[in-house]
Amino acid sequence: TEINWQWQHNIEQKIKQKFAINCIINPLTVIYNCQNGSLKNIAGCKYIIEKLANEISNTVSDIGWSSEELITETNNVITLTATNKSSMLTDYQNNKATEIEFLNKQLSNVAKKNNIDIPTNSAILCLLSTLIQRQNDGQNNYN
């Protein structure tokens, strides 16, 4: 089997780009309990993706993409991985620790350190924290 690979001269930038895309896609798949591709069909999700992309591009230095480019790349990944279930959703569904601390919480820490306001990411963290806590408490509904 032939392996298709490409040498990356700026690996740090590629890591930051993957981080940025994962900060958008992964938590949304948990919140909406869906595969990646379904994010394109959920009302309001486009708006959240745009807001997160703006916040990330203002917070993560040397990402190499404008917020518009990050939106485009995120949508490309959503399309290319349409039938995939994000690792965060898989972990959440299996009652395992998610990588939220390494993604959106880390983004929040960088923003705080640099006095950058990222309200959409803060809302995402709050929603995920509530979902995870309710799951840990064995509560599946809000009654």
Model-derived segments and spans:
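NAD(P)-dependent Rossmann-like dehydrogenase/reductase catalytic/cofactor-binding core
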Residues: 50-143
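Internal alpha-helical scaffold of NAD(P)-dependent oxidoreductase catalytic cores
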Residues: 1-68
